[in-house]
Amino acid sequence: MGSEMCIRDSGNGGAAGSGGNGGDAGTGVSSDGFAGLGGSGGRGGDAGLIGVGGGGGNGGDPGLGARLFQVGSRGGDGGVGGWLYGDGGGGGDGGNGGLPFIGSTNAGNGGSARLIGNGGAGGSGGGGAPGSVSSGGVGGAGNPGGSGGNGGVWYGNGGAGGAAGQGGPGMNTTSPGGPGGVGGHGGTAILFGDGGAGGAGAAGGPGTPDGAAGPGGSGGTGGLLFGVPGPSGPDG
């Protein structure tokens, strides 16, 4: 009873608040040829004594004006689970628009659990930018998925990796599509628990030829004392 009273006196804040979504940029073009970037998603709040971490907000899309690169803003990371018990929050999704040839990691990562609880799932990567004159017509690479959060130090499964974003389409029917992104890495279990599953790889963007499919993410490591590794994600 005494320990129960201590827990009650400490209070249980419940689930933490989620991070806000980043706004999309407008369509205007600045003097250097760049349109504005979308806002980044907010990080999810951490839980108190017992509770689930808040989910990360989604990243905004870039503006639609002509520019050298289109970059989708990053999704926020998930919040950490409660000190005694609680799962980590899920990561936010990345905005659409990846650098040509390079998948900028813009998906939020899942939050980790502290003592007992499962890691949060990673967010999805944003899709690649459409091909443009500045990219030689080639579609941009899809963004990788976010990593799953780690399970609790004592017990908990790793979070699943996020799905990757599809490659961007070629500028026209004779332009190559961009490569699909790589699936996110599954979260790790510490002592007891299974590793998180890897995220799914994404298909390449349409074009001539179509972009290469992205591989699935690797599964997370199982617990040191008990647990199995997570499975790899499917290829795009």
PLM feature spans:
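Long, compositionally biased tandem-repeat segments
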Residues: 1-4, 8-236
